[in-house]
């Protein structure tokens, strides 16, 4: 019942499966296999969340990951269909760098970072991943970078200045 209610509350979310991994636990009688799934969901207009689910079967792991992603959504201040300013993010051994791009550039990003940017609603961006390319760490680093991005309006409000003073 909870699954049906969650889908009815947010029917317009884009969902992407990034990775499925088989893991094993060694016990006295042999190995027990289970699966992990990494997913991202977003509304294409600045809301994004990621989830990591574990279960004995692949569909159950994906479903758990999607539910966690819907619960852990953040808002991102976008500038049209690109970023406000260049941002860096870091998680564990992964570092990501993203900067806004002009109209028509597209999403220049690889793997896990591309999926996060697509569901967020970013259409023009240049990005690079340094260090570890582990999908979980890259997704966390990308989301932390997007979370730390501020619009000129929010910076002006915090500092008590006008927007043209912030932009120079």
UniProtKB/Swiss-Prot annotation:
GO terms for biological process: translation. Transmembrane segments: none annotated. The keyword Transport does not apply. GO terms for molecular function: rRNA binding; structural constituent of ribosome. Residues 13-76 form the S5 DRBM domain. Keywords: Ribonucleoprotein, Ribosomal protein, RNA-binding, rRNA-binding. GO terms for cellular component: small ribosomal subunit. With S4 and S12 plays an important role in translational accuracy. Located at the back of the 30S subunit body where it stabilizes the conformation of the head with respect to the body. PANTHER family: MITOCHONDRIAL RIBOSOMAL PROTEIN S5 (PTHR48277:SF1). Belongs to the universal ribosomal protein uS5 family. Part of the 30S ribosomal subunit. Contacts proteins S4 and S8. The N-terminal domain interacts with the head of the 30S subunit; the C-terminal domain interacts with the body and contacts protein S4. The interaction surface between S4 and S5 is involved in control of translational fidelity. This is Small ribosomal subunit protein uS5. It comes from Pseudoalteromonas translucida (strain TAC 125). The gene is rpsE.
